[in-house]
From Swiss-Prot:
Organism classification: Archaea, Thermoproteota, Thermoprotei, Thermoproteales, Thermoproteaceae
UniProt catalytic activity: UMP + ATP = UDP + ADP
Family: Belongs to the UMP kinase family.
Assembly, per entry: Homohexamer.
Key words, A-Z: ATP-binding, Cytoplasm, Kinase, Nucleotide-binding, Pyrimidine biosynthesis, Transferase
Name the record gives this protein: Uridylate kinase
GO cellular component: cytoplasm
Class of the enzyme per the UniProt entry, highest EC level: transferase
UniProt pathway: Pyrimidine metabolism; CTP biosynthesis via de novo pathway; UDP from UMP (UMPK route): step 1/1
Residues holding ATP: 6-10, 39, 43, 134, 139, 142
Length: 217
């Protein structure tokens, strides 16, 4: 079984958490690809570039290189992972044929790492994408502002897309965007969104549990 894990860039702001994810990924006997976000490193550099008048394309490139640096860090911790960070889908496929864990960051300007994760899942023939996010599940509204917001353990893609489009969930773009949803839906790939602070949830999901939100066709 092929599995893709999308790691929020925020995870890389905590050294201990990154180490725990490396151990979690090494411990599971499935074929895994990982896509990393840029996190605080990307935000800080992009902010400086924006103040200096850099174009949106150049700002995107900075974010891409930050995500690739996070990917390289994870590769260094995994030991036997593919040693290079693929920079496009062709390079990913070449790396994937090595039968080792492959870790990617961003691919091109104007494209989120959520979309990269969806493209990687499609190319790898993965049946599942695990999204280690900055929230523990998908909610009907922002639970930090609305204590009556409903936690949604199961969603269909159409329902999830409506939530993302409504922007009722802060960070929705980080969870997924409409491009990534479109790619995942056309391949009927099951998505789990779970608390990125809990690397042990990877094992729980692979055992058939649902610690967050499960999204299906």
């Amino acid at each position: 079984m092929a599995v893709v894990v999308k790691l929020s860039g925020r995870i890389f702001e905590d050294e201990e958490l990154v180490l725990k994810y490396a151990e979690a990924i090494k411990s599971y006997g499935v074929k895994i690809a990982v896509v990393t976000g840029g996190g605080e490193l990307a935000r800080r550099y992009i902010s400086a570039a924006k103040r200096g008048g850099a174009s949106n394309t150049f700002q995107d490139l900075i974010g891409i290189y930050a995500s690739r640096l996070n990917a390289l860090l994870l590769i260094s911790l995994l030991g036997d992972a593919y040693p290079k960070v693929p920079t496009n889908i062709e390079e990913f496929l070449e790396a994937w044929r090595s039968h080792r864990v492959v870790v990617a960051g961003g691919f091109q300007p104007g494209q989120s790492t959520a979309t990269v994760a969806a493209l990687v899942a499609e190319a790898a023939g993965a049946s599942v994408l695990l999204n280690a996010a900055n929230i523990d599940a998908v909610y009907s509204d922002d639970p930090r502002k609305n204590p009556k917001a409903e936690r949604l353990p199961h969603l269909k893609y159409d329902e999830f897309e409506r939530i993302v489009r409504s922007s009722s969930l802060p960070g929705g773009y980080e969870l997924m965007d409409v491009w990534s949803i479109s790619i995942l839906r056309r391949n009927c790939i099951t998505v789990y969104i779970f608390d990125g602070r809990r690397p042990e949830h990877i094992g729980a999901i692979l055992r058939g549990e649902n610690p967050g939100t499960k999204i299906t066709c």
